[in-house]
Amino acid sequence: VCSSDLAEKVRTMVADEKMIRGLLKQNQKTPSLRFGATLTIGEFLLPQRLNTYLQEHSQTSLTMIVENTATLLQMLNSGDIGFAFVEGYFPKQTYDWQLLSQERYIAVKGKDYNLQKEVHCLKDLVQETLIVREEGSGTREILERGMQEINLSISSFERIIEIGNVQAIKTLVRNNQGITFLYEAAAREEIEKGELEVIDLYDFHILHEFNYITLKDSVFKQQYDAFFASVQRP
C-alpha cells in the first residue's frame, strides 16, 4: 500500500469514527444524513430534487450545509459531513465521485443595463463593473480559469464588487449595478421572466460538472449512494 492510499484510508476511518460518535451522542431513533452543497447546487438544483427522497424516506432526518467548495472539502475530510455536492474543482483521485449534472456557465446583465460598448468577446466586457463571488467559491474559480485561457483575469475589469451570496448578486445585477457570471441553473427563473439577459460571447463557452463526492471506502457509502441515486433523477 503506497503512503497516499494509506493516508486516505486513515482519513476515512477518522471521519467515519467522528460521524458514528455524533450519531451515538444524538441517540436518534430515526436515521440521519448530514451533507454539504455549494451555493448554486444547494439553492437552485437540490431543492427541486429532494421530493422523491423525502417521500421514500419519511423517517430520515436531513441536515444540508451550504458552503463554498473549499470549506466543504475541509468538512468532508474531518467528518463534519458525510458527503458533498460541489461545483468547484477538487482532486478527483483523492475522493470517490460521480457526476450529478453538467451546467452551462454564462454572463448575464439586467434587462435595462447599458453595456459600455458593443460586445462580442470577453475582452469587450472589461470596462464593466463585475460582480463576483468571494475567493474560495467554486463559481468564482470557474470564471478565473475560463479567463486565464484567453489571457484575462478578474482584475482586468474596471471595477469589481465581491458578494458572498448568489441572490444578492442577482439583485444587484437586476438593478443594473453591473454584470456577473453564474450557472444558468441559478438564473433560469430570472432569464425566463426577462429580468436578466444572457450576454453572448463567442470566446467564452463553459459547460461545467456538478459532482457528488464522498471519502473513499466510507462505511456509510451505501447509505450516501442511495441518497445520490434519488436526487440524480431530475
Regions found by a protein language model. Give the residues of each.
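Short beta-strand->loop
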Residues: 96-106, 158, 192-206
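Central regulatory/effector-binding core of bacterial HTH transcription factors
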Residues: 30-92
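Alpha-helical linker/hinge and terminal dimerization helices associated
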Residues: 6-27, 227
